[in-house]
Amino acid sequence: MKKVLFASSECVPFIKTGGLADVVGSLPKCFDKRYYDVRVILPKYSCMKQQWKDMMQYKTHFYMDFAGQSQYVGVLECVYDGVTFYFIDNEHYFTGDKPYTEHHWDIEKFMYFDRAVLSALPLLDFRPDVIHCHDWQTGLIPVYLHDSFAGGDFFRGIKTVMTIHNLKFQGNDGVEQFKRISGLSDYYFTIDKLRTGVDGNMLKGGLVYADAITTVSNTYAEEIKTQFYGEGLDGLMRARANDLRGIVNGIDYVDYNPDTDKNIVVRYNYDNVLEKKIHNKRAIQAELGLAQDDNRFMIGIVSRLTDQKGFDLIAYMME
């Protein structure tokens, strides 16, 4: 049986700010449990709803050298929807009313998280064949695996996959600050490794040292090899083109089933879609103060208002 660990800064239903949480919450439960043991590890934020905290059970704790101090690392565990979830607990780093805060503080706390994930694994009775890292917040996991965790039988042979959900956000900080907190040596701060300009770059570290790289579509995989879309990392993307794959995010057919979805006005299915779905169109027209017209073309987009999401293309087509 193959063992896979998803490492992420967010995951539904526990904590969500964007689409990353949907992917990390939905994909693990889609693996065939006869062949794959897929688990997820993420921070235990104080801003998580109490109902999720109440499900967590103490697993273990230890102290870890980090940024010149001995830091507490607690590990909690729960099983939800057939998937085992681990939560890294540290009130110093994960207390607050939202998961992401001030930029420099986020850099430090996710460096802590990445090191804590690897430090905790030998105590969890779970040795993954693959660690699947998501976005810049987990970018140092592949780096640490090649550095301070490279020795010993436990970590030998563990592979990493780095998935880019949004290349724009990379986890940059000044090189000296980056070195001091991460504990990484000067060796890693060259332009072919973690350095970009005057900064250390967490995402770049993951992209350099991961065994494979994925992103959210074949089109995006090609786009990020270009200077226009590459966010300063297009050269690295071209260099790693043989290891880069685009995989389109799927749909959760349980949560987004219109026949059972309690969040729509009228539920429908394959047999009655033409009769029933129109009621939802009328409802949103009424809610938005629009003319209720069954023949009026409507486009609905669940998205952030950013140029990355293609709103310029919609405006162009409308014109």
Model region roles, listed by residue range:
Residues 1-319:
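Catalytic cores of nucleotide-sugar-dependent glycosyltransferases that transfer UDP/GDP/TDP-activated
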